[in-house]
Curated annotation (Swiss-Prot):
The keyword Membrane applies. It comes from Macaca mulatta (Rhesus macaque). Disulfide bonds join 201-232. This is Tumor necrosis factor ligand superfamily member 6. The gene is FASLG. It is found in: Cell membrane; Cytoplasmic vesicle lumen; Lysosome lumen. One of its GO terms (biological process) is release of sequestered calcium ion into cytosol by endoplasmic reticulum. Residues 43-69 have a biased composition (Pro residues). Glycans are attached at residues 183, 249, 259. Residues 20-70, 117-155 are annotated as: Disordered. Keywords: Apoptosis, Cell membrane, Cytokine, Cytoplasmic vesicle, Disulfide bond, Glycoprotein, Lysosome, Membrane, Nucleus, Repressor, Secreted, Signal-anchor, Transcription, Transcription regulation, Transmembrane, Transmembrane helix, Ubl conjugation.
Amino acid sequence: MQQPFNYPYPQIYWVDSSASSPWAPPGTVLPCPTSVPRRPGQRRPPPPPPPPPLPPPPPSPLPPLPLPPLKKRGNHSTGLCLLVMFFMVLVALVGLGLGMFQLFHLQKELAELRESTSQKHTASSLEKQIGHPSPPPEKKEQRKVAHLTGKPNSRSMPLEWEDTYGIVLLSGVKYKKGGLVINETGLYFVYSKVYFRGQSCTNLPLSHKVYMRNSKYPQDLVMMEGKMMSYCTTGQMWAHSSYLGAVFNLTSADHLYVNVSELSLVNFEESQTFFGLYKL
């Protein structure tokens, strides 16, 4: 029995993943032609194995990490230099401002001084033209004062005084031969102190006086006098002081002196025995 061999073969499909067709996208299954004749006694070929599954698409690569920005060493130093320059410029501007302020102040003072000087000059010129000259400047009056201290080598009357060393003072008054000479008439306060002392008391009367000499008077004029009686205990050591002081109207050329009754009993220490005056 003959079998008909003209029955159609089943369609066979080939897959070509690498081939590309202008009208089909990649990976499309194309059918094989059905008109391929089968040979006699040829068996039907086994069906082709199924195509292997397509590998999964590779994972998308991660984007590269951004590189850290490189630090620019020059930026730090440049900023520091700019800051220093800014402060230097600021200090210079401040100094310039202070200098201008001082200059303005000095110019203002100079202008005021010139104005006051011109006003004084104008006033003096007007006074000269009118005939009323400005009064002369007042002279500072020299103070009339004297303070003399005891002189240990004094051996005669009237008492001599120290007028150079120690705590002495002479101004506007002369000292001549134990006396103070008045140069200007006026009111004066005259004072004198004498310190007496002895090893053994004899109770001799002691006197202390200030007197004045002037060519107008025929004899000495006693101004002040002090007398001491019974001032100590007989036979014992003793010390006593006598002080005189008063205000007098003295005239020019008056000479003032001090006299005591017992010169040998006088202690001439500068703080104990002295003579002076001053004008009121």
